[in-house]
Protein backbone atom coordinates (compact mmCIF):
# COMPACT_ATOMS: atom_id res chain seq x y z
CA UNK A 1 0.00 0.00 0.00
CA UNK A 2 1.15 3.53 -0.76
CA UNK A 3 2.33 5.53 2.26
CA UNK A 4 1.56 9.21 1.84
CA UNK A 5 4.13 11.89 2.56
CA UNK A 6 3.79 13.88 5.78
CA UNK A 7 2.94 17.11 3.91
CA UNK A 8 0.27 15.26 1.95
CA UNK A 9 -1.16 13.77 5.13
CA UNK A 10 -1.43 17.24 6.70
CA UNK A 11 -3.42 18.53 3.73
CA UNK A 12 -5.66 15.45 3.82
CA UNK A 13 -6.27 16.13 7.50
CA UNK A 14 -7.29 19.71 6.67
CA UNK A 15 -9.79 18.46 4.08
CA UNK A 16 -11.17 15.85 6.48
CA UNK A 17 -11.74 18.29 9.35
CA UNK A 18 -13.27 20.88 7.01
CA UNK A 19 -15.73 18.22 5.87
CA UNK A 20 -16.42 17.14 9.46
CA UNK A 21 -17.31 20.69 10.53
CA UNK A 22 -19.62 21.11 7.55
CA UNK A 23 -21.40 17.87 8.43
CA UNK A 24 -21.85 19.00 12.03
CA UNK A 25 -23.42 22.26 10.82
CA UNK A 26 -25.83 20.27 8.66
CA UNK A 27 -26.56 17.90 11.56
CA UNK A 28 -27.47 20.86 13.80
CA UNK A 29 -29.69 22.37 11.12
CA UNK A 30 -31.51 19.07 10.66
CA UNK A 31 -31.91 18.70 14.43
CA UNK A 32 -33.45 22.18 14.65
CA UNK A 33 -35.80 21.50 11.74
CA UNK A 34 -36.89 18.17 13.24
CA UNK A 35 -37.44 19.71 16.69
CA UNK A 36 -39.67 22.47 15.33
CA UNK A 37 -41.75 20.06 13.26
CA UNK A 38 -43.23 18.83 16.57
CA UNK A 39 -44.88 22.28 16.83
CA UNK A 40 -46.03 22.22 13.23
CA UNK A 41 -43.26 24.62 12.21
CA UNK A 42 -41.44 23.87 8.96
CA UNK A 43 -38.26 25.75 8.09
CA UNK A 44 -37.53 25.32 4.40
CA UNK A 45 -36.28 27.20 1.40
CA UNK A 46 -34.43 29.77 3.50
CA UNK A 47 -30.86 29.14 2.39
CA UNK A 48 -28.00 29.10 4.85
CA UNK A 49 -27.99 32.86 5.50
CA UNK A 50 -31.74 33.08 6.14
CA UNK A 51 -31.96 30.00 8.36
CA UNK A 52 -31.11 31.79 11.61
CA UNK A 53 -33.67 34.56 11.05
CA UNK A 54 -36.40 32.13 9.99
CA UNK A 55 -35.97 29.99 13.11
CA UNK A 56 -35.95 32.97 15.48
CA UNK A 57 -39.08 34.45 13.90
CA UNK A 58 -40.87 31.09 14.04
CA UNK A 59 -40.42 30.73 17.83
CA UNK A 60 -40.58 34.41 18.80
CA UNK A 61 -43.77 33.95 20.84
CA UNK A 62 -42.43 31.08 22.98
CA UNK A 63 -39.88 32.18 25.60
CA UNK A 64 -38.56 28.70 26.48
CA UNK A 65 -38.27 27.47 22.90
CA UNK A 66 -36.72 30.79 21.86
CA UNK A 67 -33.98 30.35 24.46
CA UNK A 68 -33.42 26.75 23.42
CA UNK A 69 -33.19 27.67 19.74
CA UNK A 70 -30.87 30.56 20.56
CA UNK A 71 -28.42 28.09 22.12
CA UNK A 72 -28.65 25.79 19.10
CA UNK A 73 -28.25 28.65 16.62
CA UNK A 74 -25.29 30.06 18.55
CA UNK A 75 -23.58 26.67 18.38
CA UNK A 76 -24.37 26.46 14.66
CA UNK A 77 -22.93 29.93 14.04
CA UNK A 78 -19.71 29.02 15.88
CA UNK A 79 -19.31 25.82 13.85
CA UNK A 80 -20.03 27.66 10.61
CA UNK A 81 -17.41 30.29 11.44
CA UNK A 82 -14.75 27.65 12.06
CA UNK A 83 -15.80 25.75 8.95
CA UNK A 84 -15.27 28.96 6.97
CA UNK A 85 -11.86 29.33 8.58
CA UNK A 86 -10.80 25.86 7.41
CA UNK A 87 -12.30 26.43 3.95
CA UNK A 88 -10.27 29.64 3.62
CA UNK A 89 -7.19 27.64 4.61
CA UNK A 90 -7.95 25.13 1.84
CA UNK A 91 -8.18 27.99 -0.67
CA UNK A 92 -4.88 29.38 0.63
CA UNK A 93 -3.11 26.03 0.24
CA UNK A 94 -4.51 25.59 -3.27
CA UNK A 95 -3.27 29.04 -4.29
CA UNK A 96 0.26 27.97 -3.33
CA UNK A 97 0.15 24.86 -5.50
CA UNK A 98 0.82 25.19 -9.22
CA UNK A 99 -0.63 21.72 -9.81
CA UNK A 100 -3.89 22.63 -8.03
CA UNK A 101 -4.13 25.85 -10.02
CA UNK A 102 -3.78 23.83 -13.22
CA UNK A 103 -6.56 21.50 -12.06
CA UNK A 104 -8.79 24.49 -11.41
CA UNK A 105 -8.33 25.65 -14.99
CA UNK A 106 -10.61 22.71 -15.85
CA UNK A 107 -14.27 23.87 -15.89
CA UNK A 108 -16.17 22.60 -12.85
CA UNK A 109 -13.09 21.97 -10.70
CA UNK A 110 -12.96 24.05 -7.51
CA UNK A 111 -10.33 24.27 -4.74
CA UNK A 112 -11.68 21.35 -2.69
CA UNK A 113 -11.78 19.00 -5.69
CA UNK A 114 -8.31 20.09 -6.81
CA UNK A 115 -6.71 19.59 -3.40
CA UNK A 116 -8.60 16.34 -2.76
CA UNK A 117 -7.43 14.88 -6.06
CA UNK A 118 -3.82 16.02 -5.69
CA UNK A 119 -3.43 14.66 -2.17
CA UNK A 120 -5.18 11.39 -2.98
CA UNK A 121 -2.80 10.78 -5.89
CA UNK A 122 0.26 12.06 -3.99
CA UNK A 123 2.74 10.27 -6.28
CA UNK A 124 1.49 10.10 -9.90
CA UNK A 125 4.28 7.71 -10.94
CA UNK A 126 2.52 4.85 -9.14
CA UNK A 127 -0.15 4.86 -11.88
CA UNK A 128 0.78 3.60 -15.35
CA UNK A 129 -2.39 4.71 -17.15
CA UNK A 130 -5.15 7.26 -16.60
CA UNK A 131 -7.60 4.34 -16.38
CA UNK A 132 -5.66 3.08 -13.36
CA UNK A 133 -6.42 6.38 -11.63
CA UNK A 134 -10.12 6.07 -12.45
CA UNK A 135 -10.13 2.52 -11.08
CA UNK A 136 -8.33 3.69 -7.93
CA UNK A 137 -11.22 6.05 -7.19
CA UNK A 138 -13.89 3.48 -8.04
CA UNK A 139 -15.03 5.21 -11.24
CA UNK A 140 -14.63 2.17 -13.49
CA UNK A 141 -17.19 -0.59 -13.99
CA UNK A 142 -17.05 -3.74 -11.92
CA UNK A 143 -16.32 -6.81 -14.01
CA UNK A 144 -17.10 -10.44 -13.38
CA UNK A 145 -17.29 -13.71 -15.25
CA UNK A 146 -20.70 -15.19 -15.88
CA UNK A 147 -21.37 -18.92 -15.88
CA UNK A 148 -20.66 -18.99 -19.60
CA UNK A 149 -17.30 -17.23 -19.09
CA UNK A 150 -18.57 -14.01 -20.64
CA UNK A 151 -16.92 -10.90 -19.21
CA UNK A 152 -19.74 -8.76 -17.82
CA UNK A 153 -19.54 -5.07 -16.85
CA UNK A 154 -21.70 -3.69 -14.07
CA UNK A 155 -22.04 -0.43 -12.17
CA UNK A 156 -18.96 1.49 -11.04
CA UNK A 157 -17.03 -0.30 -8.30
CA UNK A 158 -17.07 2.63 -5.81
CA UNK A 159 -13.72 1.45 -4.50
CA UNK A 160 -11.18 3.79 -2.92
CA UNK A 161 -11.68 7.27 -1.50
CA UNK A 162 -15.40 8.10 -1.48
CA UNK A 163 -14.81 11.81 -0.83
CA UNK A 164 -12.54 12.22 -3.85
CA UNK A 165 -14.96 10.22 -6.00
CA UNK A 166 -17.82 12.46 -4.84
CA UNK A 167 -15.78 15.60 -5.56
CA UNK A 168 -14.90 14.40 -9.06
CA UNK A 169 -18.53 13.49 -9.73
CA UNK A 170 -19.73 16.92 -8.54
CA UNK A 171 -17.09 18.66 -10.67
CA UNK A 172 -18.17 16.63 -13.72
CA UNK A 173 -21.83 17.38 -12.99
CA UNK A 174 -21.02 21.09 -12.74
CA UNK A 175 -19.26 20.98 -16.09
CA UNK A 176 -22.21 19.18 -17.69
CA UNK A 177 -25.00 21.31 -16.22
CA UNK A 178 -23.73 24.71 -15.04
CA UNK A 179 -20.78 25.52 -17.29
CA UNK A 180 -22.11 27.58 -20.22
CA UNK A 181 -18.95 27.81 -22.31
CA UNK A 182 -17.63 25.45 -24.97
CA UNK A 183 -15.57 22.50 -23.82
CA UNK A 184 -14.48 19.32 -25.63
CA UNK A 185 -15.06 17.07 -22.62
CA UNK A 186 -18.52 18.56 -22.05
CA UNK A 187 -19.44 17.96 -25.71
CA UNK A 188 -18.14 14.40 -25.44
CA UNK A 189 -20.20 13.88 -22.27
CA UNK A 190 -23.34 15.25 -23.92
CA UNK A 191 -22.93 12.73 -26.73
CA UNK A 192 -22.75 9.91 -24.17
CA UNK A 193 -25.85 11.27 -22.42
CA UNK A 194 -27.79 11.12 -25.70
CA UNK A 195 -26.79 7.49 -26.25
CA UNK A 196 -27.19 6.38 -22.63
CA UNK A 197 -28.22 8.56 -19.67
CA UNK A 198 -27.07 11.67 -17.82
CA UNK A 199 -25.68 9.77 -14.80
CA UNK A 200 -23.46 7.55 -16.94
CA UNK A 201 -22.29 10.60 -18.89
CA UNK A 202 -21.29 12.39 -15.68
CA UNK A 203 -19.35 9.32 -14.47
CA UNK A 204 -17.56 9.15 -17.84
CA UNK A 205 -16.65 12.84 -17.62
CA UNK A 206 -15.42 12.34 -14.04
CA UNK A 207 -13.12 9.58 -15.29
CA UNK A 208 -11.59 12.02 -17.78
Give the role of each language-model region.
Residues 1-208:
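A detector of single, family-specific signature residues
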Amino acid sequence: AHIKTESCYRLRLLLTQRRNLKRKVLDLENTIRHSLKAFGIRIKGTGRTGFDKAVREAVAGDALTSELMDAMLTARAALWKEYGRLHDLVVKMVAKSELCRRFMAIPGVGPVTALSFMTAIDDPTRFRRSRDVAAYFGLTSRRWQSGTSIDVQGRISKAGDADVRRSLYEAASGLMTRFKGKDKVKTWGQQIAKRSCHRKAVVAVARK
